[in-house]
């Protein structure tokens, strides 16, 4: 079903989608919309590092998918005036892969590791000395001929991004001097992002159209941009010169995205909990089995937003559907749960 992992998916789908994201990315902190606290702090840290002619401290960015962690890493590199190498935790399978990446870095460069919580343990342990003292020791050869080789590294900045900060080991987490939590975006921030993206797309959008789109974007820029692309298609086929609220509502109704940004999977999840488990508490694995989704998919893609808007709550016994969610779905809240 395309709506599951297409429109509201938090991961880019294919080369074309990735190219669109690159086109929309700001290059400087002043162009970056949202996350004001993080921007202000980074401005200070970057200016201080530049004045000392040092590499920026290692940075950990964590929060739900689609909030701009990769974009912010690239902005940091641009502000520092250095090169950036990008990779992901699963792509660094063995120590040799890490050595190859580190060997390409010049003084001050940035190494960006997405999904850093998925680094293999042996690679993570090699990172400790690289991050703290700028060297790595690797063993060359096998058996009696095996011997350690000491590799000094230039000062560099590791930027790690994760949706699961709790899965990072304490030794790795403690080596990040700068730790920033990415928050969901406000409607005003998303509206500004939508206007900026529409301009890049050479697409006209009215104020009420941008506002309506921001309401349905789950506080997430990546989703806002994806929905904008799809609504643009509907507007073009309908012969509209500009995107208004009516075409946004029409398009997203067909895509089964409601006025709070919930899609078919969100509603299926909530209705399963209500109809089969009296609104909870119910365990995540049970929910996943009932709706045919992976627990990781629910935990990373759907649950954070439902928690954010107060539609579910987490308890030691499982997830609960809140009265607010019942009201949104048009279902009367059971009197025996009051």
From Swiss-Prot:
Signal peptide: none annotated. Keywords: ATP-binding, Cytoplasm, DNA damage, DNA recombination, DNA repair, DNA-binding, Hydrolase, Nucleotide-binding. ATP binds at residues 24-25, 66, 69-71, 132-134, 175, 185, 222. Residues 1-14 have a biased composition (Basic and acidic residues). The keyword ATP-binding applies. Its main location: cytoplasm. Gene3D superfamilies: 1.10.8.60, P-loop containing nucleotide triphosphate hydrolases, Winged helix-like DNA-binding domain superfamily/Winged helix DNA-binding domain. Residues 186-256 are annotated as: Small ATPAse domain (RuvB-S). DNA binds at residues 314, 319. The keyword Oxidoreductase does not apply. Its EC number is 3.6.4.-. It catalyses: ATP + H2O = ADP + phosphate + H(+). Residues 1-21 are annotated as: Disordered. One of its GO terms (cellular component) is Holliday junction resolvase complex. GO terms for biological process: DNA recombination; DNA repair. GO terms for molecular function: ATP binding; ATP hydrolysis activity; four-way junction DNA binding; four-way junction helicase activity. SMART domains: AAA. Mg(2+) binds at residue 70. Residues 3-185 are annotated as: Large ATPase domain (RuvB-L). Residues 259-338 are annotated as: Head domain (RuvB-H). Belongs to the RuvB family. Homohexamer. Forms an RuvA(8)-RuvB(12)-Holliday junction (HJ) complex. HJ DNA is sandwiched between 2 RuvA tetramers; dsDNA enters through RuvA and exits via RuvB. An RuvB hexamer assembles on each DNA strand where it exits the tetramer. Each RuvB hexamer is contacted by two RuvA subunits (via domain III) on 2 adjacent RuvB subunits; this complex drives branch migration. In the full resolvosome a probable DNA-RuvA(4)-RuvB(12)-RuvC(2) complex forms which resolves the HJ. The RuvA-RuvB-RuvC complex processes Holliday junction (HJ) DNA during genetic recombination and DNA repair, while the RuvA-RuvB complex plays an important role in the rescue of blocked DNA replication forks via replication fork reversal (RFR). RuvA specifically binds to HJ cruciform DNA, conferring on it an open structure. The RuvB hexamer acts as an ATP-dependent pump, pulling dsDNA into and through the RuvAB complex. RuvB forms 2 homohexamers on either side of HJ DNA bound by 1 or 2 RuvA tetramers; 4 subunits per hexamer contact DNA at a time. Has 3 domains, the large (RuvB-L) and small ATPase (RuvB-S) domains and the C-terminal head (RuvB-H) domain. The head domain binds DNA, while the ATPase domains jointly bind ATP, ADP or are empty depending on the state of the subunit in the translocation cycle. During a single DNA translocation step the structure of each domain remains the same, but their relative positions change. This is Holliday junction branch migration complex subunit RuvB.
């Amino acid at each position: 079903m395309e709506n599951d992992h297409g429109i509201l998916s938090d991961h880019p789908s294919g080369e074309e989608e990735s190219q669109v994201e690159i086109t929309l990315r700001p290059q400087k902190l002043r162009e970056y919309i949202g996350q004001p606290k993080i921007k202000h702090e980074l401005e200070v840290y970057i200016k201080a590092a530049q004045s000392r002619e040092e590499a920026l401290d290692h940075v950990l960015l964590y929060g739900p998918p689609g909030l701009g962690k990769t974009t912010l890493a690239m902005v940091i590199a641009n502000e520092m005036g250095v090169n950036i190498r990008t990779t992901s935790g699963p792509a660094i399978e063995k120590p040799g892969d890490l050595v190859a990446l580190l060997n390409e870095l010049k003084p001050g460069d940035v190494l960006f590791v997405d999904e850093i919580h998925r680094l293999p343990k042996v690679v993570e342990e090699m990172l400790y000395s690289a991050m703290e003292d700028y060297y790595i020791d690797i063993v060359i050869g096998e058996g009696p001929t095996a011997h350690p080789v000491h590799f000094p590294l230039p000062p560099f900045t590791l930027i790690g991004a994760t949706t699961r900060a709790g899965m990072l080991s304490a030794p790795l987490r403690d080596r990040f001097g700068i730790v920033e939590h990415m928050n969901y975006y406000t409607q005003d921030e998303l509206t500004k992002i939508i206007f900026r993206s529409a301009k890049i797309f050479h697409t006209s959008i009215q104020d009420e159209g941008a506002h309506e789109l921001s309401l349905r974007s789950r506080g997430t820029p990546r989703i806002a941009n994806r929905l904008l692309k799809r609504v643009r298609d509907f507007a073009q086929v309908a012969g509209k010169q500009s995107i208004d609220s009516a075409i946004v509502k029409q398009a997203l109704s067909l895509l089964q995205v409601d006025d709070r940004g919930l899609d078919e999977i969100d509603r299926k999840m909530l209705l399963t909990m209500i109809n089969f488990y009296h609104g909870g508490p119910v365990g995540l694995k049970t929910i996943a089995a009932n709706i045919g989704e992976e627990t990781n998919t629910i935990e990373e893609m759907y649950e954070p937003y439902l928690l954010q808007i107060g539609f579910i709550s987490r308890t030691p016994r499982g997830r609960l559907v809140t009265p607010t969610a019942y009201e949104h779905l048009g279902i009367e809240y059971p009197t025996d749960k009051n």
